[in-house]
Amino acid sequence: MKWIKEVFGTEKPIVAMCHLQAMPGDPYYDKGKGMKDVLDKARHDLLALQNGGVDAVMFSNEFSLPYLTKVKTETVASMARIIGELKDEIEVPYGVNCLWDPIASLDLAV
């Protein structure tokens, strides 16, 4: 497909996952370390993936357990904040996935 090569620069892109740590509202969110820790870990993973040569990155709320079919507002807001703060460092095409909630995923993507 021609569009794949146009978007990713290759016919067989490697899309890597950047799994975000538990965020505010999640049962396993570490309030002591706060959002700075979530952001720092996401930045570390993003840079490692890009330096490793991936063609794209997908951000996901992997550690927002348990997965919900309707994620909490603070999950979407936290993901938006993290991705927004990393935006200047993102060098490849990227996407978002709010696990089990396609509407929230689209809200973030737009």
Question: What are the residue ranges of the model-derived segments?
Answer:
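A short, N-terminal amphipathic alpha-helix
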Residues: 41-53, 85-88
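Glycine-rich, proline-tolerant flexible connector loops at the mouths of alpha/beta enzymes
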Residues: 50-78
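Catalytic cores of alpha/beta
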Residues: 101-110
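N-terminal carbohydrate-binding accessory modules
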Residues: 1-7
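Active-site phosphate/pyrophosphate- and oxyanion-stabilizing loops and adjacent acidic/basic residues
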Residues: 2, 84, 107
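Alpha-helix-loop-beta-strand connector modules within alpha/beta enzyme cores
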Residues: 10-11, 16-17, 68-96
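N-terminal glycine-rich anion-binding loops that anchor highly charged ligand groups
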Residues: 10-24, 48-61
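Active-site mouth loops of central-metabolism enzymes
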Residues: 19-44, 93-102
